[in-house]
Amino acid sequence: MDYDVLILGGGIIGCAIAYELSKYNLNIAVIEKDYDICNDTPSINTATIYDGLECEDELSSKLIRKGNLLMEEYALRFKVPYKRCGTLYIARNEIQAISIDKMYERAKAKKIDDVKLLIGKEILEYEPNIEGNIIKSIYIPNTGVISSYDLALAYGEIAFDNGVNFRLQEEVESINSINKGFKIKTSKNKFTCKIVIDTTKDKNLQLVNENNKEDDKGKYMKYVVIDKPYEKLYSNIIFDVRENERIYIRPTINNETIGAYSNYKNVHYDKVIEKIKPLTKEISENDIKVVRDWRLFDEPIIIQDDIINSGYINIKVNHYAKVTITPYLALNISKLVVEKLNCKFKKDFNDKRREYFRFKNLSNEERNKIIKLDSKYGRIICQCEKVSEGEIVDSIRRPLGARTVTGVKRRTGAGFGSCDGCYCKDKIIEILAREMDKRVTEVVNNSKDSTILLSRIKEFDEM
């Protein structure tokens, strides 16, 4: 066999499973069709760590709660920015209050004692700055926020350093059963393996039949980053409970404020501001720093591991709490594989991620020390987010380094500022071209057909 395990899909779950399996004496590959890994994490590099009480599906709720309990351990291990903060689900009328009561009943049924049902002004004890006529709320203490892309990258980078082969820009075309394994045909090659772990959403590749119909019922999520420190507004995440809508406000890891609104219609961002205004006090268009879109799914989680004896595991997590679920799910899938293949732990497993610098978070003394070692850190490329050339170069040279403008942007924050990359994008393209030994016209934004500079008016020796 070419590989012991082939993981289809290099999203956060595929990378997390690769990390857990890289601890053992296995030959592993991850096949990802995109230029980069972890493209399924939100472009705004902060995800909510949920508790599971808001979820009615039993399996989803269990996975979320178990993942929540593991998250702090993994964040500390990988040195990923992570912040614990409580969540308040609020109801402004009797209809909304029914949802609050259901959540509280679920908590009692599961013997979860750390949630609190608050009536009327009791909420002010937990969030004194909240305004409006709130008749009922539920307080959940063990939620939080995490740098989701950093977490996903950490999984991938450590797996790569421990021997996992990441095959990017390679699309799976077919999977066929053979004696004691599978034959995989991709757009570039053919492989055999003992076990396939399919984390993709492409039903055409799945060998098992599902009763669930494939659909696209995801909600449209609109994020707005508000130019106000979150600590001046609230200390907890605030969810305004609505039927078929999600309205919330939460901090980012950098203490910025995110307001979010979602429903099944792709609304204009003016509607988003209107919806989140009751939670954000006085805001205007001038307070909006960045606007981003995302798709929000709440589909049942499918984990078909009952056919592990045949060597095929199908995982489908099209769910808003995917980041929260990941640690527990990956740990359990790896246990199944280890038991199936009877493999042993690597003595030379390296569980450390290579360090990196966030220049804007350092003191002047720390900055000067780094600049003495590498002068590239003394040249600021992104003025909005204070990202240096040294950070961009490091993001390209790291394990599974950036190969696109979006890859640099997500790893470093360059281009996420109020100018949305107008000032720094050309410079990022130059650095990418130089580091990859390519022409600037060959550098892409995020995918094969997303070239930014189409042609040159005149050829120069340098750009």
Regions found by a protein language model. Give the residues of each.
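Glycine-rich FAD pyrophosphate-binding loop
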Residues: 23-44
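Helix-rich C-terminal "cap"/substrate-channel and partner-interaction subdomain
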Residues: 281-402, 406-418, 422-463
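Helix-loop-beta segment of a Rossmann-like dinucleotide-binding subdomain
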Residues: 81-89, 124-154, 158-162, 261-263, ...
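N-terminal Rossmann-like FAD-binding beta1-loop-alpha1 element of flavoenzymes
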Residues: 3-30
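Dinucleotide-binding Rossmann-like beta1-alpha1 core, especially the glycine-rich loop
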Residues: 46-122, 126
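Helical element adjacent to the flavin cofactor pocket in flavoenzyme catalytic cores
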Residues: 138-187, 191-195, 199
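Glycine-rich, N-terminal phosphate-binding loop of Rossmann-like dinucleotide-binding domains
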Residues: 10, 53, 200-201
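Active-site substrate-recognition segment that forms the wall
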Residues: 19-20, 49, 80-82, 195, ...
